[in-house]
């Protein structure tokens, strides 16, 4: 879902969202909330409303915020039970400065890479682990190349349901009964 003409309606995952407005990262701050109820309160509350406003300023009309889960850890080296366990492990993290800095502060070797390269990189030992919501871990079969899963709910992964603002305005004019 972009402000341009290529995409009209869709879901905007949290990682590209800050490309449109860096303030959107605020919804994914590490350990902001540790439960799904808390994540829903953040998405449905003032922070979610602000994120939608910021995207609107960039030509993206938000229709709602879905919940993609929490970002969890997998790795092939050892169980992670404390920050010390992360030392020396090379993790692929989502490409935002916030995630890179978080992992570095925890002592991990944090790198970014295209998600399409992750499975092969894990197989070949280029990286030792990564972080994603469990739905992505499962659907991408990453559990086939990772021995350890750490459920630490460190970052809420919202899914912005959105539409190009120009298209939405046109549809509202065409169908005046539409409302959000």
Model-derived segments and spans:
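N-terminal secretory/targeting leader peptides
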Residues: 1-38, 46-180
């Amino acid at each position: 879902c972009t402000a341009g003409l290529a995409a009209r309606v869709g879901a905007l995952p949290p990682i590209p969202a800050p490309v449109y407005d860096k303030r959107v990262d605020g919804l994914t701050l590490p350990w902001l909330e540790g439960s799904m109820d808390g994540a829903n309160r953040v998405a449905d509350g003032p922070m979610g409303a602000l994120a939608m406003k910021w995207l609107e300023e960039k030509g993206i009309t938000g229709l709602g915020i879905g919940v993609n889960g929490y970002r969890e850890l997998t790795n092939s080296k050892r169980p992670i039970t404390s920050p010390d366990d992360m030392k020396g492990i090379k993790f692929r993290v989502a490409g935002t400065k916030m995630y890179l800095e978080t992992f570095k502060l925890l002592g991990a070797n944090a790198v970014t890479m295209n998600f399409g390269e992750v499975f092969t990189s894990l197989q070949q030992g280029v990286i030792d682990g990564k972080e994603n919501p469990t739905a992505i871990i499962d659907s991408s079969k990453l559990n086939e190349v990772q021995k350890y899963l750490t459920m630490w709910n460190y970052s809420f992964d919202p899914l912005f349901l959105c539409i190009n603002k120009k298209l939405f305005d046109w549809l509202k004019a065409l169908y005046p009964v539409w409302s959000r």
